[in-house]
Amino acid sequence: MNIAAKPPLTIRLCGPRGFCAGVDRAIQIVVLALKSYGAPVYVRHEIVHNRYVVEGLEAKGAVFVEELDEIPAEHRAQPVVFSAHGVPKSVPEDAASRNLFYLDATCPLVSKVHKQAMRHNRLGRHVVLIGHAGHPEVIGTMGQLPEGSVSLIETIEDADAYVPVDPDNLGYVTQTTLSVDDTAGVITRLHERFPNLTAPAADSICYATTNRQEVVKQAAPGCDLFIIVGAPNSSNSKRLVEVALRAGAKKSILVQRAAELDWDEIGAISTLGLSAGASAPEVIVNEIIEAFRARFDARVELAETVQETENFLVNRELRNIELTAADMAFVNG
């Protein structure tokens, strides 16, 4: 019996992809807290926007809540971790009022945006925050400042319609996970309308967001399909889907697990682009590759722009706890 040959497929695997230093740090904080203090360790909001990661931490003993009042009184001696997206100032204040011990896993680059916004405010500027309404990072940044001292701008249309009280006394910051190109367009329009608009001391969009978008731009032309591994509530992952389409991929989709792949819809392809959002673990990237290898004679080509070496330290309370490869195998493989 003749066995049909698998059709050839080139997979353009983007690098860098997947976890950034801030996500790595946040997950490590929860893992180390569990090793140090024992289960349960409470986490306010998803530590990062990825269900695979959340479920892996739940299996280790983490309990995810949306508000601090969900923590049972009998467990208030256990630590609570704040997510990588950052929280309003009111959250640690609430934790202190409840005598909760908390570990802040806010990404240091998000904390930098908080400081930039507070500096604008301290110098008397009204803060313009470029970001997506309702995103936890935006909620956290707006929550650093008094009510009414921040205006949220999402699009160029918002920038056109914006009417500030004092157009000569504005300073902007941005969410860290936005589209680099879209954000540049909004900033340009704001500068056109408000020439005295003050920029932050450093770019707010994080290195990892920029790097992942740049390599997707380079890899996308000529791809029949581009897959971004990530969750539907992951801002940076959704931006990568958009970047791939704009850069020339015929189709781009967001996938959480290989089981979601619709092979009838994928059809006959010869070139596949593959990357992962900053909160998507490498084990799922490998899972996707193996799913395609089962159906295609797949050859993987690495499309790499830069190598990332950034590393953020965990909280001081956890630095003497050993973190092993086995501790992180659930996400790293």
From Swiss-Prot:
Pathway the protein takes part in? Isoprenoid biosynthesis; dimethylallyl diphosphate biosynthesis; dimethylallyl diphosphate from (2E)-4-hydroxy-3-methylbutenyl diphosphate: step 1/1; Isoprenoid biosynthesis; isopentenyl diphosphate biosynthesis via DXP pathway; isopentenyl diphosphate from 1-deoxy-D-xylulose 5-phosphate: step 6/6
Does Metal-binding show up as a keyword for this record? yes
Where (2E)-4-hydroxy-3-methylbut-2-enyl diphosphate is bound, by residue?
49, 85, 135, 176, 234-236, 279
| Keywords associated with the record | 4Fe-4S, Iron, Iron-sulfur, Isoprene biosynthesis, Metal-binding, Oxidoreductase
Q: List required co-factors.
A: [4Fe-4S] cluster
- Among the Pfam families in the record, one is LYTB
Stated family: Belongs to the IspH family.
**What is the protein named?**
4-hydroxy-3-methylbut-2-enyl diphosphate reductase
What's the source species for this entry?
Answer: Rhizobium johnstonii (strain DSM 114642 / LMG 32736 / 3841)
The lineage is:
Bacteria, Pseudomonadati, Pseudomonadota, Alphaproteobacteria, Hyphomicrobiales
Its gene?
ispH
